[in-house]
Amino acid sequence: FMSIEDMHQDLAMMQISDSFFPTGLYANSNGLESIFQNNKKITELEIIGIIKTQLKQQIGPTDLIVMINALKFASTKEFDKISETDMKINSMKNIKEVREASKRSGIQLARCVNEFVNDEILEKYLKFYKKGMINGAYSVSFGLCANALGISPQKASLMFLYGFIVS
């Protein structure tokens, strides 16, 4: 039997992993959509190769680690570390379109979750965003939302990677 806490985590996980949840995840597909928009011929194996490379070289060592740290810092209410993490990941996204897509998706996710969850850290993050004091990076916002929803780091990691793969 699953505990009530496990069921709550799984329900929250499904809720923000739903493709109808309005976060604009497609904007974070790291250019995969442009392959299809430009009618480029690409095989299934090539798509798998692109996704594997991005998971190993970008998403895993940067965005995933940032998300896990943001979740951890939110759980211990270390807002200064959340802010620092947000600034660092933003500075690592050298391509303007990727950086802007991360911000748009991150803030949209935070705003949506904030509508149905009462969380002090998430509210503070959104206030700091309005004041221009943080960027709203998607990986940071995701970690804060996972914490606000009571989702474990392991389940949040699976959700985060799943979101990248299907976007």
Regions found by a protein language model. Give the residues of each.
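Short, conserved micro-motifs enriched in small and acidic residues
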Residues: 18-26, 100, 136, 159
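Charged, compositionally biased N-terminal leader segments and the immediate start
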Residues: 2-13
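C-terminal auxiliary extensions adjacent to catalytic cores
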Residues: 40, 160-167
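A short glycine/serine-rich beta->alpha loop
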Residues: 13-22, 51-57, 91-98, 126-132, ...
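A generic alpha-helix surface/boundary motif
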Residues: 26-30, 139-140, 167
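Inter-helical turn/loop segments and adjacent helix faces that build the functional surface
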Residues: 35-45, 116-124, 148-156
